[in-house]
Amino acid sequence: MALPNQQTVDYPSFKLVIVGDGGTGKTTFVKRHLTGEFEKKYEPTIGVEVHPLDFFTNCGKIRFYCWDTAGQEKFGGLRDGYYIHGQCAIIMFDVTARLTYKNVPTWHRDLCRVCENIPIVLCGNKVDVKNRQVKAKQVTFHRKKNLQYYEISAKSNYNFEKPFLYLARKLAGDANLHFVESPALAPPEVQIDLAAQQLHEQELLQAAAHALPDDDDEAFE
């Protein structure tokens, strides 16, 4: 699908919209992919930057046209033009800022109002930061809405490929699809405590085994 400012390529390409509160790290995340950063285009009518992110799979190359809001969400909601023709999405929140997680349902609602039945990944960013405010076990929204959830650290490249691989598998209808080489990523700006992160991953697994709370906000009181 050729969208504004997107060159047509002869391999599968998809419009990926990335939403979430301002300051959650959406732009930092997209900019890690160096060729996408180099080839980005600005779409002035909607006020977004479109980054073409290529990935190499066992079934050939695929491209995600990542639409980045350029900070517009700080001034209110996004226009429908941002969402229209979206084929997949990432909702991002900051694990060091509780409000950004509390606002996830609003972003999800806005997204689903325009884009029905598209694959969506929820990402908790900044897991490299020590003073985490949203604990792994408190993240339950994805279970209620049947979304995939990943903990990421954009600045350290931790789990960078996972959201894209999940979306690629869903869009291709192939659970065995895999990446055969890594994209060129910017060097890590921070190092992540892998032992601490493995502990969070364990908490996620344990949380998944428990019944869902009635109210998402209970854990924050």
UniProtKB/Swiss-Prot annotation:
Positions in coiled-coil regions: none
Function: GTP-binding protein involved in nucleocytoplasmic transport. Required for the import of protein into the nucleus and also for RNA export. Involved in chromatin condensation and control of cell cycle.
One GO cellular component term noted in the UniProt record for this chain: nucleus
Species: Nicotiana tabacum
Region annotation (Switch-II) ranges: 71-87
Boundaries of every Small GTPase Ran-type domain copy: 10-174
Lineage: superkingdom: Eukaryota
Name of the protein in question: GTP-binding nuclear protein Ran-B1
Subunit text: Found in a nuclear export complex with RanGTP, exportin and pre-miRNA.
A matching Pfam family: Ras
Molecular function GO terms recorded: GTP binding; GTPase activity
Region annotated Switch-I, chain positions: 40-48
Subcellular locations according to the entry: Nucleus
Family designation: Belongs to the small GTPase superfamily. Ran family.
Positions of GTP binding: 21-28, 71, 125-128, 153-155
Subcellular location, principal: nucleus
S-S bridge residues: none
